[in-house]
From Swiss-Prot:
Family membership noted in the UniProt record: Belongs to the C19orf12 family.
Transmembrane segments: 33-53
Recorded topology in the membrane: Single-pass membrane protein
Protein name as catalogued: Protein C19orf12 homolog
GO CC annotations on file: cytosol; endoplasmic reticulum; mitochondrial membrane; mitochondrion
Annotated keywords: Cytoplasm, Endoplasmic reticulum, Membrane, Mitochondrion, Transmembrane, Transmembrane helix
Localization in the cell: Mitochondrion; Mitochondrion membrane; Endoplasmic reticulum; Cytoplasm, Cytosol
One GO BP annotation of this record: apoptotic process
Protein's UniProt keywords contain Transmembrane: yes
Major location category of this protein: mitochondrion
First and last residue of the signal peptide: none
Amino acid sequence: MPIMVDDIMRLLCSISQERKMKAAVKHSGKGAMVAGAMAFVGGLVGGPPGIAVGGTVGGLLGAWMTSGQFKPVPQILMELPPAEQRKLVNEAMAIIGNLDWTDAVQLTALVMSNQAMQQRLLAMLTTYVTKELQAEIRYED
């Protein structure tokens, strides 16, 4: 049922776009790698004091590199691998399974007219992004 997956992914993108959701996926591994590399280079250049200076500079650089990289949630959702999209669709189907639709436009209209269903899908999406993707969510004004 690739059409159903596409319909539900478009619905989730519409909901997150309407709420202007952005998420920053934490790249702690990248930051740690930068900090470690800088400590190593500092140690080679300056000995033990160089390790301290390199680690400090690397830690600050790593934190700066990985902070504030917010992307729109619809973009993140569409970039998910197919297995993750199916997982998300299965969670959404538990909420919208009783609806009958023919295409993404009709499905979106049905859900957008039902505030309770919209809230449940938004909560499911927020939980998925924060827990599964380990991302921080921000809503634009």
